[in-house]
């Protein structure tokens, strides 16, 4: 059915005059009206008028006509019998009627208890109209005892939707049930008792608001009035309930089929005292609590439904009860409880907006009788800000059989701000699992795809490129388990920072000193005497008693997985190296036992790595690709800007960028996986005489005649462990020369583009990029250098800034000596300078000077051990004039390495008798490096200043170093340290 509301504006000031002249009468509509049509068959017009003055509470004056006027009449249907209470004359008749009702209520309670025993859950929220009884005389008696005008309630035991009035009279083209003219204002939907100060959206007041409403799904739709003026607006009560007898008690726990919870009430209680809430199924109630098929609430907690009864006490008729804590029909907003998010005005005489009736979830239950309630669709809504007479709501009510909100979650915790200027639309397509009125609290989204386990840590992060102190920073004891994805130099376009393929890390590379290929970090604390202590978790060591000295394999692995070095020597797996000959294979096997091998990631595409191929931990696909690309001498060209993303999915899209990434990762066809593995004697073969013969088996019996000499005393566990510990200690205590040999960086590729012409700017830019990569390796090499970490951080940075050019040129001479026999300058495997390129680079004289150093290596037949110690001495060969912060530690470290070089020269078998001469030659070679480096720095500083004009690129690492070094060198603050006087 439909409900049409018409806007009615105030008719002017004469409305107040006509308001006061209206006679106080209740006009009963006749039953035989012929003006009813099919369209307005179920439409009613409730016109509520109030006199300007309120009638006193204790007024005993008035004629019987006035009493008759205050008794609302319930019109009955022609086809259904009804009880019409027209007049109660004597108190005797009231008592007889009360006794009859009490008896019927007792019978009802017995049946209810029996039914509730079997169907407790279904009966809790049942709205069957067959369980509704009347208690008229109790209400009349209660009003008489309290000195109020008598009011009459009458209802009938019949279905809700059929319990409607057919007696009509035509008013404003609609069907009018009753025109109530009393000093009390009524609500629109089965109106609750109102006061002239408090009115809802469909109350006729002096402002002249008329509303057309239908009470389709209710019974007993009539007002019972008391001359009490309510002090609280209907829509602004502290506890506002919805239709369907959903009560909000202080505990917010009440429904149709169960009593309101209060400290003094109990469930299914048949007797309710004034402070307690009467149960729906309680037939007996005190004079102050009259219950007709509904719950009774105290003045602070009002139970509402379709029809409203207002009195100073608590009276309920399956209806809304308006008391000092007034409540309204339908879904009404209050500052405390709002089930359907409807707005409400203030708590004073301001106007309040009450939406249409929305069924409560407590009115229906699965298995119980369903009562269809109207589903409302808002056509026109208005927002009132305190103006009483300017708000009317037009709504169309559509009776739909499936319009129940049976499973809507209308919890009491749904609190909407009462002064919100917006209202949620009434029409809600709720399902059985929808939650209306509950505030959504968004939880942070959890990533469903967790990060990969941190099996590989890359150190080529931005801090490595842009901050020298970041790499040399002090180690930290712990770090996050995530990984850093930027494992390649600048110029390679990386994946965005979204955790797509490479695990990401929030830890700078400076936090880790050494990392093995499995992802374990090691912090080296190297003393001035060259002894090394390694901090490692006890559970990772195979022998707990070996924690006093570090295994060599950890030192071997410490450099291998640094960024693009990536465990190129030992296949990424821990192995033992440099074990003396006197250590048996059983001892080696026992020491080399470790944990399971962790998974690795390909440095090129991010796929699972299959091993160390061509010096880099890569997958099999990148291994085959690199071999074919280099051996086939393919000149790949990138269709983009040489910055394509190379990953597991897109690695085949651009072979040029893939090859560039392979080269920058450090792949080399000539790379030796294990440069020094198995070189020493006794590693792969053992002398038979070193193996003690196994003892003969003991004789089976004395009669066998064999003699067996048993040991005098079997050694205990502690005594047997001492020689093993001493042997292992000697084996696993490396010398500085061993450490230097194992931490030596691998060869880095320059990433030279053969497709570009060999111009000076291209060659110089390529050399600068190569120098930037090599500087990252130099910094990490110095970080694990024995004794270098004992220096203050500022001293470490100063030494690297002063010696970076010397270290680069000395390493270039060594590579040229080893790979080309000093015929060419071997900058990188993909960048070798011959005479022609030396001229094209605009630095021919400097290239010739570096070539002369390489020729000296041939003349001296320099060994790798000598080269590594000499390189450390070059790191310590230039200091500031003012000295370092820790000059004593620096001098001690330098002296130790000079002694180590002297020992190395003495041990050389080819230099017997000539050790001092060789030592002199080696130190003279170190002195000659200073002159060459001065010329190289002068050229480098010039190109750095004129880089824009010369179009020469400098990487970020070189920019940082040169910017700090240039003013110090030009000011004469750098002081080279010579072995011999000039």
Curated annotation (Swiss-Prot):
<feature type="binding site">
    <location>
        <position position="943"/>
    </location>
    <ligand>
        <name>21-hydroxyprogesterone</name>
    </ligand>
</feature>
<feature type="region of interest" description="Important for coactivator binding">
    <location>
        <begin position="780"/>
        <end position="783"/>
    </location>
</feature>
<dbReference type="InterPro" id="IPR013088">
    <property type="entry name" value="Znf_NHR/GATA"/>
</dbReference>
<feature type="binding site">
    <location>
        <position position="768"/>
    </location>
    <ligand>
        <name>progesterone</name>
    </ligand>
</feature>
<keyword id="KW-0804">Transcription</keyword>
<feature type="binding site">
    <location>
        <position position="622"/>
    </location>
    <ligand>
        <name>Zn(2+) 1</name>
    </ligand>
</feature>
<keyword id="KW-0446">Lipid-binding</keyword>
<feature type="modified residue" description="Phosphoserine">
    <location>
        <position position="298"/>
    </location>
</feature>
<feature type="binding site">
    <location>
        <position position="605"/>
    </location>
    <ligand>
        <name>Zn(2+) 1</name>
    </ligand>
</feature>
<feature type="DNA-binding region" description="Nuclear receptor">
    <location>
        <begin position="602"/>
        <end position="667"/>
    </location>
</feature>
<dbReference type="GO" id="GO:0005654">
    <property type="term" value="C:nucleoplasm"/>
</dbReference>
<feature type="binding site">
    <location>
        <position position="774"/>
    </location>
    <ligand>
        <name>aldosterone</name>
    </ligand>
</feature>
<feature type="zinc finger region" description="NR C4-type">
    <location>
        <begin position="602"/>
        <end position="622"/>
    </location>
</feature>
<feature type="binding site">
    <location>
        <position position="774"/>
    </location>
    <ligand>
        <name>progesterone</name>
    </ligand>
</feature>
<feature type="region of interest" description="Disordered">
    <location>
        <begin position="683"/>
        <end position="708"/>
    </location>
</feature>
<feature type="binding site">
    <location>
        <position position="815"/>
    </location>
    <ligand>
        <name>aldosterone</name>
    </ligand>
</feature>
<feature type="binding site">
    <location>
        <position position="768"/>
    </location>
    <ligand>
        <name>21-hydroxyprogesterone</name>
    </ligand>
</feature>
<feature type="compositionally biased region" description="Pro residues">
    <location>
        <begin position="690"/>
        <end position="701"/>
    </location>
</feature>
<feature type="compositionally biased region" description="Polar residues">
    <location>
        <begin position="291"/>
        <end position="328"/>
    </location>
</feature>
<feature type="compositionally biased region" description="Low complexity">
    <location>
        <begin position="258"/>
        <end position="290"/>
    </location>
</feature>
<dbReference type="Pfam" id="PF00105">
    <property type="entry name" value="zf-C4"/>
</dbReference>
<feature type="modified residue" description="Phosphoserine">
    <location>
        <position position="286"/>
    </location>
</feature>
<keyword id="KW-0675">Receptor</keyword>
<keyword id="KW-0863">Zinc-finger</keyword>
<feature type="binding site">
    <location>
        <position position="774"/>
    </location>
    <ligand>
        <name>21-hydroxyprogesterone</name>
    </ligand>
</feature>
<dbReference type="GO" id="GO:0008270">
    <property type="term" value="F:zinc ion binding"/>
</dbReference>
<feature type="domain" description="NR LBD">
    <location>
        <begin position="724"/>
        <end position="962"/>
    </location>
</feature>
<feature type="binding site">
    <location>
        <position position="638"/>
    </location>
    <ligand>
        <name>Zn(2+) 2</name>
    </ligand>
</feature>
<keyword id="KW-0238">DNA-binding</keyword>
<feature type="binding site">
    <location>
        <position position="619"/>
    </location>
    <ligand>
        <name>Zn(2+) 1</name>
    </ligand>
</feature>
<feature type="region of interest" description="Disordered">
    <location>
        <begin position="230"/>
        <end position="328"/>
    </location>
</feature>
<feature type="zinc finger region" description="NR C4-type">
    <location>
        <begin position="638"/>
        <end position="662"/>
    </location>
</feature>
<keyword id="KW-0539">Nucleus</keyword>
<feature type="region of interest" description="Modulating">
    <location>
        <begin position="1"/>
        <end position="601"/>
    </location>
</feature>
<feature type="compositionally biased region" description="Low complexity">
    <location>
        <begin position="345"/>
        <end position="354"/>
    </location>
</feature>
<dbReference type="GO" id="GO:0005737">
    <property type="term" value="C:cytoplasm"/>
</dbReference>
<keyword id="KW-0597">Phosphoprotein</keyword>
<feature type="region of interest" description="Disordered">
    <location>
        <begin position="345"/>
        <end position="375"/>
    </location>
</feature>
<keyword id="KW-0963">Cytoplasm</keyword>
<feature type="binding site">
    <location>
        <position position="768"/>
    </location>
    <ligand>
        <name>aldosterone</name>
    </ligand>
</feature>
<dbReference type="InterPro" id="IPR000536">
    <property type="entry name" value="Nucl_hrmn_rcpt_lig-bd"/>
</dbReference>
<feature type="modified residue" description="Phosphoserine">
    <location>
        <position position="282"/>
    </location>
</feature>
């Amino acid at each position: 059915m439909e409900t049409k509301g018409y806007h009615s504006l105030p008719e002017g000031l004469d409305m107040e005059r006509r308001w006061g002249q209206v006679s106080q009468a209740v006009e009963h509509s006749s039953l035989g009206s012929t003006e009813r049509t099919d369209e307005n068959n179920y439409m009613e017009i409730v016109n509520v008028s109030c006199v300007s003055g309120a009638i006193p509470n204790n007024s005993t004056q008035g004629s019987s006509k006035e009493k008759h006027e205050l008794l609302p009449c319930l019109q009955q249907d022609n086809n259904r019998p009804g009880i019409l209470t027209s007049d109660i004359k004597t108190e005797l008749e009231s008592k007889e009627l009360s006794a009859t009702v009490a008896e019927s209520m007792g019978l009802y309670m017995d049946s209810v208890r029996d039914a509730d025993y079997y169907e407790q859950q279904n009966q809790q929220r049942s709205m069957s109209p067959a369980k509704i009884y009347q208690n008229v005389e109790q209400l009349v008696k209660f009003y008489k005892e309290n000195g109020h005008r008598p009011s009459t309630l009458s209802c009938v035991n019949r279905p809700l939707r059929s319990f409607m009035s057919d007696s009509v009279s035509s008013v404003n083209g609609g069907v009018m049930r009753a025109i109530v003219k009393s000093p009390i204002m009524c609500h629109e939907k089965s109106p609750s008792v109102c006061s002239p100060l408090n009115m809802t959206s469909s109350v006729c007041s002096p402002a002249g608001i008329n509303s057309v409403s239908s009470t389709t799904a209710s019974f007993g739709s009539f007002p019972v009035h008391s001359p009490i003026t309510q002090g609280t607006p209907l829509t602004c009560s502290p506890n506002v309930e919805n239709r369907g007898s959903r009560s909000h008690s202080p505990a917010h726990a009440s429904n149709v089929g169960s009593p309101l919870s209060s400290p003094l009430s109990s469930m299914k209680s048949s007797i309710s005292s004034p402070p307690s809430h009467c149960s729906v199924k309680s037939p007996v109630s005190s004079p102050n609590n009259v219950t007709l098929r509904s719950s009774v609430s105290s003045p602070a907690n009002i139970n509402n439904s379709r029809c409203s009864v207002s009195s100073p006490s608590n009276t309920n008729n399956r209806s809304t009860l308006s008391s000092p804590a007034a409540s309204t029909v339908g879904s009404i907003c209050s500052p405390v409880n709002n089930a359907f998010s409807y707005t409400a005005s203030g708590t004073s005489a301001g106007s309040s907006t009450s939406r249409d009736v929305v069924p409560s979830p407590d009115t229906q239950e699965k298995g119980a009788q369903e009562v269809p309630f109207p589903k409302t669709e808002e056509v026109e809504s208005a927002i009132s800000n305190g103006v009483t007479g300017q708000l009317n709501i037009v709504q169309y009510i559509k009776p739909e059989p499936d319009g129940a909100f049976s499973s809507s979650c209308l919890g009491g915790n749904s609190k909407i701000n009462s002064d919100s200027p917006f209202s949620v639309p009434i029409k809600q397509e709720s399902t059985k699992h929808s939650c209306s009125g509950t505030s959504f609290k968004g939880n942070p989204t959890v990533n469903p795809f967790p990060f990969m386990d941190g099996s590989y840590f890359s150190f080529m992060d931005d801090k490595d490129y842009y901050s020298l102190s970041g790499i040399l920073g002090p180690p930290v004891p712990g770090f996050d388990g995530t990984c850093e994805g930027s494992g390649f130099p600048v110029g390679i376009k990386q994946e965005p920072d979204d955790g797509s393929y490479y695990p990401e890390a929030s830890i700078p590379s400076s936090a880790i000193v050494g990392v093995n290929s499995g992802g374990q970090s090691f912090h080296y604390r190297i003393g001035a005497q060259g002894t090394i202590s390694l901090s490692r978790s006890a559970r990772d060591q195979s022998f707990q008693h070996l924690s006093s000295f570090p295994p060599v394999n950890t030192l071997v692995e410490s450099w291998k997985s640094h960024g693009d070095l990536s465990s190129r020597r030992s296949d990424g797996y821990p192995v033992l190296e440099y074990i003396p000959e006197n250590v048996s294979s059983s001892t080696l096997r026992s020491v080399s036992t470790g944990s399971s091998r962790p998974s690795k990631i390909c440095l090129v595409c991010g796929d699972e790595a299959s091993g160390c191929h061509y010096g880099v931990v890569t997958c099999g696909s990148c291994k085959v690709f690199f071999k074919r690309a280099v051996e086939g001498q393919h000149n790949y060209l990138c269709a983009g800007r040489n910055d394509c993303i190379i990953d597991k999915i897109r690695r085949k899209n651009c072979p040029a960028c893939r090859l560039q990434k392979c080269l920058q990762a450090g792949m080399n066809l000539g790379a030796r996986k294990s440069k020094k593995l198995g070189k020493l004697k006794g590693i792969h073969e053992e002398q038979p005489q070193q193996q003690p013969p196994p003892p003969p088996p003991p004789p089976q019996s004395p009669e066998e005649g064999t003699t067996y000499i048993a040991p005098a005393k079997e050694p205990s566990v502690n005594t047997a462990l001492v020689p093993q510990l001493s042997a292992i200690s000697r084996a696993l205590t490396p010398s500085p020369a061993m450490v230097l040999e194992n931490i030596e960086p691998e060869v880095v590729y320059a990433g030279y583009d053969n497709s570009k012409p060999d111009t000076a700017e291209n060659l110089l830019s390529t050399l600068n990029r190569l120098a930037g990569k090599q500087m990252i390796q130099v910094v990490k090499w110095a970080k694990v250098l024995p004794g270098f970490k004992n220096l203050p951080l500022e001293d470490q940075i100063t030494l690297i800034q002063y010696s970076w050019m010397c270290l680069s040129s000395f390493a270039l001479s060594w590579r040229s000596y080893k790979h080309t026999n000093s015929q060419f300058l071997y900058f990188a495997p993909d960048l070798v300078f011959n005479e022609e390129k030396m001229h094209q680079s605009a630095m021919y004289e400097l290239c010739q000077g570096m070539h002369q150093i390489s020729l000296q290596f041939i003349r001296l037949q320099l060994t790798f051990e000598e080269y590594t110690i000499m390189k450390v001495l070059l790191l310590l060969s230039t200091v500031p004039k003012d000295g370092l912060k820790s000059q004593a530690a620096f001098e001690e470290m330098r002296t130790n390495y000079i002694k180590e070089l002297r020992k190395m020269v003495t041990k050389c078998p080819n230099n017997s008798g000539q050790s001092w001469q060789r030592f002199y030659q080696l130190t003279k070679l170190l002195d000659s490096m200073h002159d060459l480096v001065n010329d190289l720095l002068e050229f480098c500083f010039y190109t750095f200043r004129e880089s824009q004009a010369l179009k020469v690129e400098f990487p970020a690492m070189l920019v940082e170093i040169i910017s700090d070094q240039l003013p110090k060198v030009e000011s004469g603050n750098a002081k080279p340290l010579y072995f011999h006087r000039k």
